[in-house]
């Protein structure tokens, strides 16, 4: 399915940590060995754990590698332990991408850095051969997909906490097609259902003033990356806490192969 070859590269995840003024480096090396039926991914050159909750875990690291590889191989390859054994991942303990070492925090191990890392793997496969992989996509959880909490006056001031997913968009272009609008990030792959504006307003004390496709936000190229979202919403006669952790404001998602 894949040509023999080796690709490697570094992407940067933006951060306010003073140790990484250019961003946290995300590095991976991929070695495709069709003769032996193996794909080897080396992550040992990634930096040590950082004092943030974005450190990845062994499980999210393995899942990202398997997901990106199986996406490139296609749907006819079964998603099973036999296929997983053909993808050999080398990581180290105490790395920001790999096995965390106490007291490293991993509360956001499935989003921010995970999104950047999974996108990076897809982009590396795009370097291997035309028609493979994808460009970089959404990183983190934008304000349009906030976790909201508070008390709901409509329901007897009961406490609530929930995540609403409105405008979790910006799917990257692939080697064969335009980006899928509701893809979300590389770590969700379009598998998360989008929240209804009307239902969200009924369930929570919020008003959604605007939700629209952001103008001129697509990625240009042979195939086009899908656009992002513009959203405006606010609390409705109640105190509401909105929490989100977006990324890529300073380091936007990149194209591949000249896109």
What does each of the following model-derived ranges do?
Residues 1-259:
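Glycine/proline-enriched, intrinsically flexible loops and inter-domain linkers
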